[in-house]
Amino acid sequence: MAVRMGTAEQPACICDIGKMTDFHATRRLNWLGYGACAAAGCLWGAGFYFGKLALREMGVGHMVLYRFLFASLGMLPVLFVAGRPKGSPRWTNWTRRETGTLLLSSALGIPIQFLLQFEGLAHTTVSHAALMVGTMPVLLALGATLFAGERLDWIGWLALTGSTVGAALIVLGGGQAGIPGNVPTFAGDMLVVLSLVIALGWILMNKSLMQVHSPLAVTAYGILSGTVMLVLWVVAVNGPPPMEHVSLTAWMALAASGVLCTAATTLLWNWGIHHVPASRAGVFLNIEPALGSWLGVQLLGDKLGPFAWVGGGLILAAAVTLTARGHEADPEVLLE
């Protein structure tokens, strides 16, 4: 509906109320999207801390398995609404290609990524692992350059170089852990970085699936199918998970890491990047390394060496520089 406004002295203007309403609705979704990404970053920041608590009483495979069993419980209510478009009683059909992409994404993003990542955590400190995660925004930019045809300007390449140097300083800088017998190692740090490279494929494939299916559907089906793969692998390799002699602290840490740091964060992040440009939402990934390293220092007594502090600063500076700069909005995301 259009309304004519003006006087004889002042030219009239045509204001499309429908377009104004759409504009305000889009802006509200943008802010909600940014809020969802920020909340996901905060919850992700606690993931290594909860994981370290659980690793005191069980191995990596069983810890990751319990984490995703709890995450799957949190996703079950979502599953019943995820596959049905709004107002439709029928489930959305997935093509064979989309199903294959989902299964490959789930394999990369859950059993492969998390087993590698927490195997790395078992051989390094929470603070080191968290700071290594700070390289993720730069890896996202590099992945977009290599696989999505985007161009990385000189500032982007400078940020990539700074992030790489920062990671090297963290590895070489050493430090001490608050948990006796657990010190940062080169192998542990590199396993965390390798898991991030694998996570890049998971993120890019999820992004492509969300152009066709809802974030809820991609998240629910991805976590549940990945958990099935994880159960088969862990039980075959490590045997059944322990049930006895597990403390209440470990159970609470496992439940929190599954429901809050996995199910809730994935839902929040996937919904958030569906409504804002991923390039801008990436700045909230910086919350995870900052909060995670702080938790390691404050709650577990980790001590970072001077080179590690400098390296962490370089990583965070590179990530903020790359993600906080102005970008053109992605219309497919903003106008969905």
Q: What is the predicted function of each stretch?
A:
Residues 3-66, 178-208, 228-232, 333-336:
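Glycine-/small-residue-enriched transmembrane alpha-helix faces in small-molecule transporters
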Residues 41, 64-66, 128-135, 204-228, ...:
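Helix-helix packing/entry segments at the starts of transmembrane helices
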